[in-house]
């Protein structure tokens, strides 16, 4: 700060004459020394522009008086120990008003020195507050966080974000001091409205929210942004900030929070569900220009914000207002909006030296994603927050997992993949709503995984009247219809019909032991990676994210190299979900399984013979596989990087064994196996050539047919001899029927078949796993089966997904194989 002498105005009065040897000690006036670069009418009513005035300079005015002594001929003003202003006075001046402009915020001790020549007397210190929205005048916010939130910290290079909502300070009594910000990289502030057509807003709070917005927008143009609830945002006295500060409300808390956690990113989220109507006017560039300019001014006014988040629900339509949405033009308008916002933020960065982020929360259904070219938009964006929740809810009575990663176990393959026709015979248009489908669709568009953040639900959605008697699959509530939204009181965590806070679910449905309380049973769909609680007696069903499912989301994010996770909304969590976000993101990827190799030996050939050898490799993770073959000197290979190779035996004078090694790699892990190739001399009797037999499974009491493929180089007739343990019986021959005895648990036993040409014999061994499954009946075409019923058919165990009769296991989607 340069000392300002030229523009200083000094009001003074000469109260006494002759000079004394020492200056008088000045006293500062009693009035508070408070200034602000953003002036807020903390007691007023009116529009946003009437209540909030921003300026670049504050005018400091310091009234002082020296009640005794000879006065002085110059003065100095200090903020703490920093000299910020000085000037000359008529000799003997004993009172006055020092005025000067100032451009830097802070909270200081103010001192005025009255001087006679170079000898000065300093006043007692007095607090001066020069407020600005960067929060530099504030002390770090004192926190009041639920101790269930661990001190995890953030994860370098990853996103752990959460929404904080403006209205949370009311009934939920959740202000900024309660945010576990030490564990967050991002806070998304909900919500900043756009002036203009907002018909959807009339549907909530009997129109009061809409009327409040009309007041806030009274002096603004359509498509400018404002503060929706000034009392909550900037007027109300809040914990942790002096009630007399010039700027109050949760904004003052957020400013102080940045003093405690300067690396935390806080973004205003513009729009939201019932505030999305004006976005549909952005197909008009003039409207976008108005909006972008307004956002720039908003960020210049509220300096604690680190960018902007756009929550347009939804480009193309299917948002809260059924009359809005242009599937053709909304998508290009969205991309243009991102480009124009990024250009504006770049300008702001050049002006301020700061960095600003541009993010967007987006719908996660296939029908939402297909309307926007996110690959084109991503170049302007830092992150895309995929709202992978709200897949099902009490807006209708169809139950399902509202935030599952994958399809529920109750869905057919066609329902999951979006193929075939629905119950009305109408062709399905796209895959079921799941987190995985959303992420995969975005990746298929070409979106960089490092820009994708997966959504976590810190709340549950629920229904009444979900009864087991109505379930298509007994015991699976997702196959029973609801009968209206979940009901309850706010004390039970139900703030609106059909929605319950996670912390209420944990306390009132899951319980401390985790096994369910108050009549609820705790369920988890392994296939969907989705949690639910269900009260069979009263029919209450709640689908939600649990710590287990959130950890699975974190592992999914790691597996697919996503940026991280974010949650809606932080006031509904007791710390469990945010802790689980950290645990999932630091737990590593879902463990990769190494490929398996099925080929076995020895392989018998004669000199010069060519034999095909197949690695018979598979991978449980369905990873693409690569192959590498290495043959001992003498063996010739047709290739060395294919799944099967043709091996040519050398000419030998006597029986010789050679090693043939194959390595199968899934991109991360590899498996290596060596097979012995036995080469017999030409003219000598060559042993039979036997193709290795793959391992099989068979249910106890059931039979399986095993075919042995063997040839003899001389064309001799072959005989087969089977060696089996007591658990099996077998009929000899190249095609044998193996019958399993009863076992008390799954049992694996070896079976050896000896193939002989009358001179030489070759053994090949494979494993038979006997499944303990005698309790399952054989499938009967005339019998009715319901979800969960198991049967044996063709030596395999199948489980019904839902009601079925006459549909053959292995050929119909209603059955899933339990063993093969």
Curated annotation (Swiss-Prot):
Regulation acting on activity, per entry: Stimulated by magnesium ions; inhibited by N-bromosuccinimide and 2-hydroxy-5-nitrobenzyl bromide.
GO cellular component terms, semicolon-separated: extracellular region; membrane
Catalytic residues (positions): 313
InterPro entries found in the cross-reference section: Cadherin-like_dom (IPR002126), CBM5/12 (IPR003610), CBM_sf_5/12 (IPR036573), Chitinase_II/V-like_cat (IPR011583), Chitinase_insertion_sf (IPR029070), ChitinaseA_N (IPR013540), Glyco_hydro18_cat (IPR001223), Glyco_hydro_18_chit_AS (IPR001579)
UniProt similarity note: Belongs to the glycosyl hydrolase 18 family. Chitinase class II subfamily.
PROSITE patterns cross-referenced by the UniProt entry: GH18_1, GH18_2
Any Pfam family the entry gives: Glyco_hydro_18
CDD domains noted in UniProt: ChiC_BD (cd12215), E_set_Chitinase_N (cd02848), GH18_chitinase (cd06548)
GO BP: any one term: polysaccharide catabolic process
Organism annotation: Pseudoalteromonas piscicida
Protein name: Chitinase A
UniProt superkingdom: Bacteria
GO MF annotation terms: calcium ion binding; carbohydrate binding; chitin binding; endochitinase activity
Entry keyword annotation includes Hydrolase: yes
Ranges for domain GH18: 158-588
Catalytic activity: Random endo-hydrolysis of N-acetyl-beta-D-glucosaminide (1->4)-beta-linkages in chitin and chitodextrins
EC supergroup of this enzyme: hydrolase
Entry EC no(s): 3.2.1.14
Recorded coiled-coil stretches: none
Residues making up the signal peptide according to the UniProt record: 1-21
Keywords annotated in UniProt: Carbohydrate metabolism, Chitin degradation, Glycosidase, Hydrolase, Polysaccharide degradation, Signal
SMART domains: ChtBD3, Glyco_18, PKD
Thermal behaviour (record text): Optimum temperature is 50 degrees Celsius.
Keyword Transport: no
SUPFAM superfamilies the record matches: (Trans)glycosidases, Carbohydrate binding domain, Chitinase insertion domain, E set domains
pH dependence: Optimum pH is 8.0.
């Amino acid at each position: 700060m340069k000392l300002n002498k030229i523009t200083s105005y000094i009001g003074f009065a000469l109260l006494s004459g002759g000079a004394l040897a020492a200056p008088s000690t000045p006293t500062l006036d009693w009035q508070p020394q408070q200034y602000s670069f953003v002036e807020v009418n903390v007691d007023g009513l009116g529009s946003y522009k009437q209540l909030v005035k921003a300026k670049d300079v504050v005018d400091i005015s310091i009234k002082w008086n020296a009640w005794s002594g000879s006065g002085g001929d110059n003065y100095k003003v200090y903020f703490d120990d920093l000299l910020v202003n000085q000037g000359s006075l008529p000799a003997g001046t004993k009172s006055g008003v020092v005025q000067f402009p100032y451009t830097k915020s802070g909270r200081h001790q103010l001192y005025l020195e009255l001087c006679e020549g170079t000898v000065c007397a300093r006043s007692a210190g007095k607090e001066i507050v020069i407020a600005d929205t960067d929060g530099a005048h504030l002390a770090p916010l004192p926190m009041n966080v639920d101790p269930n939130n661990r001190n995890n910290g953030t994860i370098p290079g990853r996103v752990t974000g959460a929404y904080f909502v403006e209205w949370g300070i009311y009934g939920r009594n959740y202000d900024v001091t309660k945010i576990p910000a030490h564990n967050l990289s991002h806070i998304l502030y909900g919500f900043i409205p756009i002036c203009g057509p907002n018909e959807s807003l009339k549907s909530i709070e009997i129109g009061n929210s809409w009327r409040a917005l009309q007041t806030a927008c009274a002096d603004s143009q359509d498509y400018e942004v404002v503060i929706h609830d000034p009392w909550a945002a900037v007027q109300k006295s809040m914990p942790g900030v002096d009630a007399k500060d010039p700027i109050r409300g949760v904004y003052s808390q957020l400013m102080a929070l940045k003093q405690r956690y300067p690396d935390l990113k806080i973004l205003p989220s513009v729009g939201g569900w019932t505030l999305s109507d004006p976005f549909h006017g952005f197909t008009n560039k003039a409207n976008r220009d108005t909006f972008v300019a307004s956002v720039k001014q908003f960020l210049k006014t509220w300096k604690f914000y680190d960018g902007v988040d756009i929550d347009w629900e939804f480009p193309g339509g299917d948002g809260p207002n059924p009359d809005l949405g242009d599937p053709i033009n909304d998508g290009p308008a969205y991309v243009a909006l991102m480009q124009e916002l990024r250009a504006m933020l770049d300008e702001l960065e050049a002006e301020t030296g700061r960095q600003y982020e541009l993010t967007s929360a987006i719908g996660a259904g296939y029908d939402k994603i297909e309307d926007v070219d996110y690959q084109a938009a991503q170049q302007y964006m830092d992150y895309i927050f995929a709202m992978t929740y709200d897949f099902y809810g009490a807006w209708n009575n169809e139950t399902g997992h509202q935030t599952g990663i994958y399809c529920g176990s109750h869905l057919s393959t066609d329902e999951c993949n979006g193929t075939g026709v629905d119950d009305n015979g109408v062709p399905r248009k796209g895959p079921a709503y799941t987190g995985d489908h959303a992420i995969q669709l975005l990746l298929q568009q070409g979106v960089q995984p490092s820009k994708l953040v997966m959504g976590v639900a810190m709340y549950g959605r629920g229904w009444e009247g979900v009864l087991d008697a109505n379930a298509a699959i007994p015991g699976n509530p997702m196959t029973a219809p609801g009968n209206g939204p979940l009901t309850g009181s706010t004390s039970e965590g139900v703030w609106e019909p059909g929605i319950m806070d996670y912390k209420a679910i944990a306390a009132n449905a899951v319980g401390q032991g985790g096994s369910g309380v108050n009549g609820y049973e705790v369920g988890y769909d392994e296939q969907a990676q989705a949690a639910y609680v269900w009260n069979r007696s009263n029919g209450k069903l709640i689908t939600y994210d649990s710590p287990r499912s959130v950890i699975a989301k974190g592992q999914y994010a790691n597996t697919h190299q996503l940026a991280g996770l974010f949650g809606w909304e932080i006031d509904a969590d007791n710390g469990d979900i945010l802790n689980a976000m950290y645990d999932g993101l630091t737990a590593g990827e879902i463990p990769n399984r190494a490929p398996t190799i099925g080929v076995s030996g020895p392989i018998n050939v004669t000199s010069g013979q060519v034999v095909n050898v197949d690695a018979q490799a598979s991978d449980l993770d369905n990873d693409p596989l690569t192959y590498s073959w290495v043959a001992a000197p003498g063996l010739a290979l047709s290739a060395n990087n294919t799944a099967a190779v043709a091996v040519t035996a050398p000419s030998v004078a006597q029986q010789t064994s050679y090693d043939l090694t194959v390595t199968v790699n899934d991109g991360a892990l590899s498996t290596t196996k060596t097979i012995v190739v036995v080469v017999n001399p030409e003219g000598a009797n060559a042993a039979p050539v036997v193709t290795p037999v793959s391992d099989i499974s068979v249910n106890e009491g059931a039979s399986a047919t095993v075919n042995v493929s063997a040839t003899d180089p001389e064309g001799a007739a072959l005989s087969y001899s089977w060696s089996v343990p007591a658990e099996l019986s077998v009929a000899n021959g190249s095609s044998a029927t193996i019958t399993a005895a009863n076992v008390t648990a799954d049992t694996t036993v070896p079976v050896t078949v000896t193939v002989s040409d009358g001179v030489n014999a070759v053994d090949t061994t494979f494993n038979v796993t006997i499944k303990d499954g005698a309790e399952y009946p054989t499938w009967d075409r005339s019998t009715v089966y319901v979800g969960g019923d198991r049967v044996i058919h063709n030596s395999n165990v199948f489980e019904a997904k839902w009601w079925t009769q006459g549909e053959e296991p292995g050929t119909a989607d209603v059955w899933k194989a339990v063993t093969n």
